[in-house]
């Protein structure tokens, strides 16, 4: 993972499109943005690995990733994610190991919110926390 600089305007646009952040007021959005970092991964790199402890939530800024789940002796590609989509929330909400491996299918950049900051945002914004819990249970049922 490489740390990179990012465009705050682009980040604000992505956050406004991310439905569970849409309820945030401008000052809350600014607070959220102040906690976000940027990172990039090269094509073929594992962004997160199934079974590892989760420590961050990712919003895709550029590129494309694939979602892989390993069961017994097989690995299955279950999804592809594109800019403005997110991943990594499940392990942060459940405090369980990562439920999937995410691979960069091309050089990709991300906006990253680490666990401590993620938890602070959820504590300050119950509507965001509630929506993320709903998404968590929805995704968990699909797996």
Feature-to-residue mapping (PLM):
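Cytosolic regulatory regions built on CNB/CRP/Popeye-like sensor folds
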Residues: 1-143
């Amino acid at each position: 993972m490489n740390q990179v600089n990012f465009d705050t305007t682009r980040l604000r646009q992505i956050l406004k499109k991310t439905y569970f952040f849409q309820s945030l007021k401008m000052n809350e959005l600014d607070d959220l943005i102040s906690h976000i970092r940027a990172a990039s991964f090269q094509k073929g790199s594992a962004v997160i690995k199934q079974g590892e402890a989760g420590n961050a939530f990712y919003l895709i800024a550029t590129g494309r990733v694939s979602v892989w789940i390993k069961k017994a002796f097989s690995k299955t590609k279950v999804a592809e994610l594109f800019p403005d989509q997110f991943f990594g929330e499940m392990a942060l909400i459940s405090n369980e190991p990562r439920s999937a491996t995410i691979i960069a299918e091309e050089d990709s950049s991300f906006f990253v919110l680490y666990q401590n900051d993620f938890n602070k945002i959820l504590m300050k914004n119950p509507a965001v926390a509630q929506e993320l819990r709903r998404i968590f249970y929805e995704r968990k049922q699909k797996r």
